[in-house]
Regions:
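Glycine-/charge-enriched secondary-structure boundary and capping motifs
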Residues: 1-24, 124-162, 202-273
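Short, Lys/Arg- and Gly-enriched loop/turn segments at beta-strand edges
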Residues: 192-198
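Glycine-rich phosphate/pyrophosphate-binding loop regions near the starts of catalytic domains
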Residues: 25-192, 240-242
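Well-ordered alpha-helical segments embedded in enzymatic catalytic cores
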Residues: 84, 88-92, 200-204, 226
Length: 273
């Protein structure tokens, strides 16, 4: 039995506030470097991979092990708060995996309006259910969290915004993917679209990371933006036509490693020139 099993459960009035699908706001895919670059990225000189693509990595001296750290909150809350909770967890875990880390723990921050209003109570409950479903699929615990409620202006609530942080263990920071190089094969790793499939893809990527030169998840903006971001990070441009579902992962490796990766859902995109 866990201590949380004896915690009281609060029942609030709820009212579905589902909204029709809407296109992604272009503002959401603009670079955010101007925000996080204001903060010290080299605390105690342990940073071996700076933020900017998926997750940052800190070395755990004196060993060569490291911590991969990521924070994510996809802008899906107004459309579907359950999906927002699910994707916040999966995005954060994918980011950690792309940096070579095994996701080990989650923390959340739930930002909502007044939960005493039935529609806000419904949004909050659905987001929590989404976080729980994804965490269970990953078998990764939510070990902490906080809430920011009653966020309203003139009676109008902020969009439901679940944010999730993930930390993971990197076995050897010397094997963290650094960026693709000319001649590398670029592939798209996909899942079957289920939570179990997404969890399996995340496991595959962090286990394969020592053989990869780069891994980067497909999120807001689709495949084109993912390739653009990976190109900028690596310093070598690569483009490919096509589309990819949310949660797919672009990976790159030396050609001799391509056939031995062992994931059943791989699609070749090309080779870095």
């Amino acid at each position: 039995m866990l201590l949380t099993d004896e915690c009281p459960r609060y029942e609030v009035d709820t009212l579905s506030a589902a909204r029709p699908a809407a296109p992604v706001d272009p503002v959401n895919v603009e670079p955010k470097e101007w925000v996080y670059e204001q903060y010290d990225q080299l605390v105690l000189s342990r940073t071996v991979r700076r933020p900017g693509l998926d997750a940052a990595v800190l070395r755990l001296r004196p060993s060569w092990r490291g911590l991969a750290v990521s924070l994510d909150g996809p802008p899906l809350g107004e459309r579907d708060p359950f999906a927002a909770g699910v994707q916040a967890v999966l995005d954060a875990a994918r980011n950690v995996a792309c940096a070579g880390g095994e996701p080990l723990a989650l923390t959340d921050c739930l930002n909502f309006g007044n939960p005493e209003k039935p529609e806000i109570g419904w949004e909050l409950g659905r987001a929590i259910d989404g976080i729980a479903a994804a965490a269970e699929a990953l078998q990764v615990p939510v070990v902490s969290g906080n809430v920011s409620l009653y966020n309203e202006t003139d009676g109008r609530a902020i969009p439901p915004t679940p944010v999730v942080g993930c930390v993971g263990l990197v076995p050897d920071v010397r094997e963290v993917p650094r960026g693709w190089s000319p001649g590398d094969a670029v592939l798209l790793a996909e899942s079957d679209g289920t939570l179990v499939g997404d969890a399996g893809l995340i496991r595959f990527v962090w286990q394969a990371a020592p053989r990869l030169s780069l891994a980067h998840d497909v999120s807001d903006g689709g495949l084109e933006l993912a390739l653009t971001e990976a190109s900028a990070w690596s310093g070598h441009e690569f483009r490919a036509e096509g589309s990819a579902r949310l949660g797919s992962i672009v990976i790159a490796c030396a050609p001799e490693h391509k056939d031995g990766l062992g994931w059943p859902h791989l699609r070749a995109l090309g080779e870095v020139a």
